[in-house]
Regions:
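PLP-dependent amino-acid enzyme catalytic core
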Residues: 1-226
Length: 226
């Protein structure tokens, strides 16, 4: 189906300056101090999109240019067993992972898929730069899965000691590559390595928490409960 990009503006959290997203803004270029930016969506009333599948049911409140294949969503359900144990009548649990009996079908078993599908959906389809993500495990696995299944060029930087976290249900597409900081290093070393890679104009930093798509993506965890 033809998807119309979500309409939104970016707002600087430091001074309230509103501006348009030029495609991959991680900060307000006019702000004189470090600050996050947030998205304000044209559609104010929250309604899941019945015409879209999986994660993109929440596209009206996601800064996305397109939808991608293979997404799942968190699932919110009313607890019985734990609620009874705790003596609660209205306990609801939100689950992110693989539990098909409940409708949860995140094949990496990680809530980080909500971030990956949002960030990668923010990328224009004609983007030619290689996305760079630094991670200690879960984030890398989620981005690798999403990019592999949707032919998005990706370079992952992880600590060598965390290579065991990089398991997948099927082989990765060649568009995904992995580099590692030396044994004995940690997540911060992987970040430094990714920063060095991004000095080459062929690569682009994903941005981590500075990327509004990350934060709004994980916010869908709450939307599933509404």
């Amino acid at each position: 189906m033809n998807f119309t990009p979500t309409k939104y503006s970016l707002v600087c959290c430091a001074d309230g300056h509103r501006f348009e997203d030029t495609g991959w803004c991680l900060a307000d270029p006019q702000c004189g101090c470090p600050s996050l930016v947030r998205a304000e969506y044209e559609k104010k009333q929250y309604e899941p999109r019945e015409d879209l599948d999986g994660f993109y049911r929440y596209a009206d409140w996601l800064p996305v240019q397109r939808t991608l294949n293979g997404s799942g969503t968190p699932v919110t359900y009313r607890s019985t067993g734990l609620a009874a144990e705790l003596g609660l009548e209205n306990l609801y649990i939100t689950f992110s992972g693989w539990w098909p009996e409940k409708g949860a079908k995140m094949t990496t078993c990680s809530f980080k898929e909500t971030e990956a599908y949002s960030v990668c959906g923010r990328l224009c389809a004609d983007n030619r730069k290689i996305l760079v993500v630094a991670s200690a495990g879960n984030t890398a696995r989620a981005f690798a899965k999403v990019c592999s299944e949707n032919n998005i060029p990706l370079l992952i930087s992880i600590p060598a000691d965390n290579i065991g976290a990089m398991w997948f249900s099927k082989p990765l597409n060649d568009c995904v590559k992995i580099i590692a900081s030396p044994e004995g290093s940690d997540y911060y070393d992987a970040i430094v390595l990714s920063d060095k890679v991004c000095t080459d104009p062929a690569f682009m930093a994903e941005g981590g928490a500075k990327n509004v798509a990350r934060r709004d993506g994980i916010g869908t965890t709450l939307l599933t409960a509404v």
